[in-house]
Amino acid sequence: LTTLGFTGHSYTQRDREYCMSPSRTAQYKATIAKLKAEYKGKVDILCGIEWDILSEDKRTGYDYWIGSAHHLYGKNTGKYYEIDFRPQDLYDCIYDDFDGDPLAAVEAYFAEVEKVAALKPDILAHIDLIKKLNATGEFFDEESPRYKAAALKALQAAKGNNCLLEVNTGGVYRGYRKDFYPGPW
């Protein structure tokens, strides 16, 4: 092992359940700085951040950053929906703000991923996170031409911006899925 990177979630006002607060972010950076000093010459320690498109934190000041999207904005309600946590939120997003068309929500999500890719993150996180709560196909058909077209368009944006793709095992590890992100389009 020559290099080890740590990555915390950036702060977002919209959803504080999974992200570091500003004070925790400062503590995180200080802890990583101590580890860098402690392991200097043995292992390169890197300090990273998973920066959500709605984050209020800066992407600078880290050794690398991982770009991500976790929310969809509903034009009808003015709400931001976290698409990977509560099934009811995804349901409400689809029916209250995408006129009951789940693939319209999917297309909007992948458009958000394209926006993140355009910012040229070092790594693009869980590019198809919207499928997390859809293991049984209860919300949308992951094999539909619209789903695949939106996913492939986001993938092309990632490629065009030289983004590395994260292979994320979180959905499997936590029992939501049997497959990783990204899917095998």
Regions found by a protein language model. Give the residues of each.
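A metal-dependent hydrolase metal-coordination microenvironment
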Residues: 1-95, 99-107
